[in-house]
Structures are given as structure tokens and as C-alpha cells.
Amino acid sequence: MNFFMEKNKDAGHRVTIKIPKTTVNNSLLQEFIKIRKTTKINGFRKGKTPIRVIQEKYGSAIYYDIFKKLMQKFFHEFIKTEKIKIIGSPKFYIHQDEDKKKEYFEYSVIYELYPQFQIKDIKQIKVNKINVEITEEDIKKNIETNKNKKNIWNPVNKAVKSYDRVTINYCIYEKNKKIKKFDKDNISFIVSKNTLIPQLNYKIINHFVNDIIFFKIKFHAFHPEKELQNKDITFKIKIIKIEKKQELESEKSNKKNITEKKTIQTDYQTIKNNLHSQINIITDKYLENQIIQKIVEKNILLLPPLLFQKEIKNLYKQYTKQYQEENSNILEKKYHMSLDSEVKKRLYFQIIIEQIILNNKLFADENNIQKLIKKISSNYKNPMEIIKLYNKNKNLKNTMKNIELERQAMLLLKKSIKIEKQNWNFERFLNYNWASHEELML
């Protein structure tokens, strides 16, 4: 196999590979023969169609598939021969076959090398593991808070305060020119308890019905609304209604009988299990994030530019799709946040975990994968359908395999570092500023 390697400043690594035309032609011929055996074409008996006819009918599509397979095969041979490890998905480029006399086809592949990265001083890393104690009183309070209550929102003629429900109309301007397509009426939200941009929450406090508020924000370069990207936009907000909450127990919740007591006991155990489960998920993720962050702080880890840009684009596509499917509001906070930090976290996690898997030669344990599938399927009405889907779906199998490998790698990390336990009560857990760790929240 002939190849030529080069390193471009901004485009990562490139290799040009030559595939002999005889190899391509032989592969095409084998595929045409295979098609002839299984396909019947009008005017010919099955298996007797001339190769020339097969070539005329299927040539273009078959050629592309064959060449695609050969490009991947030769590239994998190249990285195996050179003993290099790539990260991300390589990009393939077919060269124009201008010189028909050449005995080979040429194509190029742009790829990114796996970062040279060694985890050092891992035993010196210290992190905190939060253990949350939940008492019977905590669970009873939770049941009381979430039991069947009817919320009544009463209009008031008072200034807006936190946890009031406010209804607004808004429109937006760029350079004093109104962009009418983004006008919105009757948008309701609870102040200080919503997913909208912080500016709206603190600007609206202490204002009254019919007050008009202006504020300006710069839209992010990757906001789903392309028309607003990188622009300074002024919002004009008009307060239509202010309401305060009044809680009333429903008639159903006032009935005291044996059936209700049994229900409460069932609710008690269910809520207890759910609380423990959710707390464990959040505290485990918090622990894992600390570990990754500490490793990055102690080790130089340079993210490949191509991989970083690709991940930015992937995340932007996800956000845009979600924005469109949910018919989201341009005031939603998550669409105004920089994607850079989220992408860095994802890539740091990916690279570190892959390095642990590579260094320790970890492999996916099929027994653990089956346990994971059973656990996931138990959350569905028809668990067997999920198990059948797993057995048929190659992508799902790969996902489960990766989850199992990540679990093993993280377990190794946890055993290698110093973990200091912190005991919290439930109230401290609830009141902790998890806003600085939004990715943990369920």
C-alpha cells in the first residue's frame, strides 16, 4: 500500500492513499457476480445475466459502495501499520481520476491523532464524596409537600416578588428596528423559578402591572435562531398580570380512611426509594466531575482543534433540533450559554476515560451489560420489548458496551484517588447551590 502523510496547520493530519485499480476492478467483479446469482433481470434467466448488463444497471451505486469500503479498509491498514491512534471520525476525500493511464486511484483522509496524554500523580488527587442522610421526618415532609394540593393563583396589584407568577408580552429590536416575527404574548412563568435568562428574572422584580421594561443582551454565536446570532438585541417587556399562589388541599386529600393510610405507606416507600436513587445519581455525577476536573488541572491535556470544532457542531445540531421540536422561547437560558465549556467537559471526559480503558486493557463484561439492560428495561411497561430491541440493534449494543467500559474506568479511578466523605443532611442537599452544577440536575 502506497501512502503519503502530511500535517496541515489548521486541518489536522492528512494522508493520501493509493488503491490499485486492479483491486477496485476485482472487488467490483465479485460484487457483480454476487448480484447476478441473486437477481433476475427481464430477458435473462436467474444467474445467467451478462456481467455487462449488471454493470450498466447497478454500476454507479455498486462502485460507490465498493470504493467506500476499500477506502475504509486501506485507511485502517494504514493506521495499523503506522501504529497510530486516532480520535473522532476521519473525513474521506476522493481525488478526481484525471489521468486515466494511472494504475491506481487516489484519495485523502483527514484525521486527528489521539492526544499524547499520560495521567500523572493520580494518587495525589483528593475529592469529596457527599453522603446524604434522609430521615423519616424528611420523607414525611416530602410527602406533605407533594401530596394532592390545588394551587390557586390570585391576581394582585402589588410589586413583583420572587415566586410570583407573572404574565408578559414582549417584542425585540436590533438597532432600534423591530423584528416582528419574534413578538410573543401571554408568556407566563414563576419568577426566580424558571429556565429563562437571569436578566429577565432580576429586571422584573419590584415592577407593577403595565410597567414596561427594557434590557439588552448579546445573542450567542450558536443560538438556534440564526437571524439573531452574534447580535445585540433589545427586549421590550410589558407586564400583563402578577399572581400570588394560594395552596388549598383538595377534598380528596382531606378524607381520612384506611385506604388512604395504605396509600400513604406505599407512597412513603416509593418516595424514599426515588429520593435515594436521585440523590445517588446527583452525588455520583458530582464526584465524577470532580475527578475529571482534578485530572485536567494536574495534567496538560490539549484538545485537538478538529475534534473540538466537530463536537461544537454536533452539540449545536442537538440544541437546534431540541429548540425546534419543543417550540422553545428565545428567552430560554440554555440557548444563551457558551457551548465551549460543555464541549470541553465532554471531550475531557471522553479522552481521560479512553486513556484509562487503553492503559488497563479493559473489556466489556457481557454479564454486566445484561444486568444493565434488565435494569433499564424494568422501567418500561413491556421490558421484553426493550431487551429484544437491544438484541437486534447494533448501535444500542455499542452504546451499552461503552457505558459498561466507562463504568469500569471510573471505578478504577475512584479506587486510585483519595476520597474524603462528607455527611450532609437532606436540608443541606436541597439548599446547596446546584445551579453551578446544572448538568447534575434531573
From Swiss-Prot:
Keyword terms: Cell cycle, Cell division, Chaperone, Cytoplasm, Isomerase, Rotamase
GO biological process, one term: cell division
Location within or outside the cell: Cytoplasm
Enzyme Commission identifier(s): 5.2.1.8
GO cellular component: cytoplasm
Pfam families membership: Trigger_C, Trigger_N
Reactions catalysed according to its record: [protein]-peptidylproline (omega=180) = [protein]-peptidylproline (omega=0)
Keyword Repeat applies: no
Enzyme class: isomerase
GO molecular function: peptidyl-prolyl cis-trans isomerase activity
PPIase FKBP-type domain residues: 163-248
Family to which this protein belongs: Belongs to the FKBP-type PPIase family. Tig subfamily.
UniProt comment concerning the protein's domains: Consists of 3 domains; the N-terminus binds the ribosome, the middle domain has PPIase activity, while the C-terminus has intrinsic chaperone activity on its own.
HAMAP family registered for this protein in UniProt: Trigger_factor_Tig (MF_00303)
Function as written in the Swiss-Prot or TrEMBL entry: Involved in protein export. Acts as a chaperone by maintaining the newly synthesized protein in an open conformation. Functions as a peptidyl-prolyl cis-trans isomerase.
Protein name: Trigger factor
